[in-house]
Amino acid sequence: MELNSTEKHVETITTHETHVLSNTKSVDELYQGRVSSTTSGSEENIATLEENDNKKLTFTTKREWFEFSLLIVGIVLAMFMMSLNSTVVAPAMSIIATELNALESQTWIATAYLVALNSFQPLSGRFSDIFGRKSVFIFGIVLFFAGSLINALSTNIDMLIAGRTIQGFGGGGVMSMTFIIVTDIAPVHLLPRFQSMLAVVYGLASVVGPLLGGAFVDHATWHWDFWLNVILAAIAFIIMVFYLKEPKEKTQTSFMSKIKRVDWLGTLFSTSFIVCLLLALNWGSPYGWGSAHSIGPFVAAGVSLIALIYIEGWVAHDPLLPARVLLNPPVTIVYGYMMCLGLTFIGTLYFGPVYYQSVFGADSTQSGLRLIPFMVCLIGGSVGGGFLIRKFPSIKYYIMIGAASNLLGYGLFYTVSETSSWGQQAGYLSFCGLAFGLSQQNSILTVQAIVEHRDMAIATSCINFFMMLASSIGIAIYQTLYQIFLKQEFAKLPLEILAGAQSYGALSNFLFIRKMPLELQRPVITAYSDAIHKVFILPIAAAALGFILTLFFRNVRYGVKPDEKRDEELSLDEKNVTL
């Protein structure tokens, strides 16, 4: 297998490797940047990002500025709708499942989307290298639009799950392509700010999602959770069709030659591995971990993984997942950290509303509002990091601060009980939001500085893939632990309280707790609180592991030129020789 070279390299981004705007100057006329990665044999390996201060993003006409601005708006809309869709149904899942008479299939409303999203996300980076950024991006938006429309018109759970699956395939392409295209079109010296913008939009939509979802459920209908994405997808599609174009060499390549470049076996087995793994995790709880529903997919996932490793390492000429990327230790560590971040992030977004509704009696809108401190600090961390990075260029330390904040936030949130004040909860969630804001875009910058430019698209898409994969696995694990701990807590209740709660349906649906007599509510609320309390041990463990991983991050320094670094090292060596 080919591993990442340890020699220093400098790769220039040219107009043949970037996208151009319709009716505007080519990208290399708008800016010229260079990304460098160096690895030394010293104890602390330093990777650097070199910025070109002589070239800036300039426009000769107002039309050029307007078209570039529209392109950015389209990218932001695409990211917003994709992220919004991941969480907008979180506070409404119980209500949707109740209305569709499908409480036993409730988790599939989220899982179907995440399984499909993770299946296509690792493919999108390589496909964009073959078929072009625009083709993959537009394809993703069209699928997302179709899935959203099906969901908005759903009258039964099967129709809804089918729509969520189609949405997921589209979302997998959209999410990765936003970061990849921004890297293509943004000047290097502005890249941290552009990626911070995407991280802000992702985090903002993730937190606004539960708020909007709750408001639609409380004051309109849950169908608007999906009609909103139909509208956003249509607008994003129109903008991208007119203002994002491929380089000429991409459009002149025949379709059949592109088809021949696809690693079809790698695509088949990577998709099979992800789908089977997530199915096994989601079927374990309802059918039993020893049942054929669980063991069968686990075995299939294992076989698919072995086949995938063999094909990518020894068979594929143009592998879907190059070993030089996945087996590059500094890159692997970043991916591991993003999995830890995804595992904690999804716990907040999905089980935060459950906690607020079951224990504190909040409605769907209120449970979304309680996530605002998380959102505010996420935005602050992302924007602040993007602006500070040029003055304090050691990216590793931003991520370390974020990881420490994540561990502190979840450690404190674990102490929340039925009597905790809203101020305490808001303060604890603020640390968690800051963690995500400081981590996501800086992790992307780290990986992009380490890998070769030809692997930039696949390396970037894998960052989002591993984060979302962990989120998908996390939902299944959280739900399983939640059900196990809830049964344990219910078993502790006196028989008369248990029977009363059962008669009101409060044991299977926390929305019915407040319909019971007051003397029955308190013990049942305590049972829900204790169960969720135990579930939140998992994000604490993930946050702790994530912090440990950041200690081994390569120190990527933004804006430090390789020549300056070498001169500094040579000067130190000369002093040592003199001594």
Which ranges hold each PLM region?
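Helix-loop-helix hairpins in multi-pass membrane proteins, especially solute transporters
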Residues: 121-265
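Interfacial helix-cap and linker-helix signal at transmembrane-aqueous boundaries
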Residues: 96-97, 127-128, 160, 212-220, ...
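Residue-level signature of mid-helix packing/kink "hotspots" within the transmembrane helices
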Residues: 87, 114-122, 172, 206-207, ...
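Hydrophobic transmembrane-helix bundles of small-molecule transporters
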Residues: 220-336
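Transmembrane core module of solute transporters
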Residues: 70-95, 101-113, 265, 292-296, ...
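Hydrophobic transmembrane architecture of multi-pass small-molecule transporters
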Residues: 53-54, 235, 444-445, 463-554, ...
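Helix-loop junctions at membrane interfaces in 12-TM secondary transporters
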Residues: 68, 153-164, 221, 415-429, ...
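Cytosolic juxtamembrane N-terminal segment immediately preceding the first transmembrane helix
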Residues: 2-84, 98
